């Protein structure tokens, strides 16, 4: 299953498009079982997209040894002071055997 967008900012100057990031996640999703390796691979690929931005990648995994028969609510909050026109984020859901929430944040740093 491919990565599906769950949320995003309304940034004008995104260093990577939503589609490019979804493709990047899809190409690397086999590494999600080792989140450190997945994050390292994603950040290395993002670093060549633009030297004017710093990137943060967050992975949240949702798994259970038993079948989940009810809806699960996961809440995550983050706060920042940033430039709404240059800084932003994409948050994707990736369904494999487990569910992963992958978020990339970019901050303009020129």
From Swiss-Prot:
This protein's record includes keyword Cytoplasm: yes
One Pfam family of this chain: Tctex-1
Location (main, coarse): cytoplasm
Cell compartment(s), UniProt: Cytoplasm; Cell projection
GO CC terms of this entry: cell projection; cytoplasm
Claim: Cytoplasm is one of the keywords in the record: yes
InterPro entries (UniProt xref): Tctex-1-like, Tctex-1-like_sf
Stated name of the protein: Topoisomerase I damage affected protein 2
Organism: Clavispora lusitaniae (strain ATCC 42720) (Yeast)
Encoding gene per record: TDA2
């Amino acid at each position: 299953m491919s990565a599906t967008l769950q949320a995003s900012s309304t940034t004008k100057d995104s260093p990577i498009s939503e589609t490019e990031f979804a493709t990047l996640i899809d190409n690397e999703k086999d590494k999600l079982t080792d989140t450190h390796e997945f994050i390292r691979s994603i950040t290395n690929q993002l670093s060549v997209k633009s030297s004017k931005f710093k990137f943060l990648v967050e992975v949240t995994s949702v798994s259970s040894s038993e079948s989940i028969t009810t809806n699960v609510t996961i809440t995550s909050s983050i706060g920042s002071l940033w430039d709404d026109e240059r800084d932003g984020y994409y948050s994707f859901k990736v369904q494999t055997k487990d569910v992963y929430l992958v978020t990339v944040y970019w901050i303009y740093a020129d």
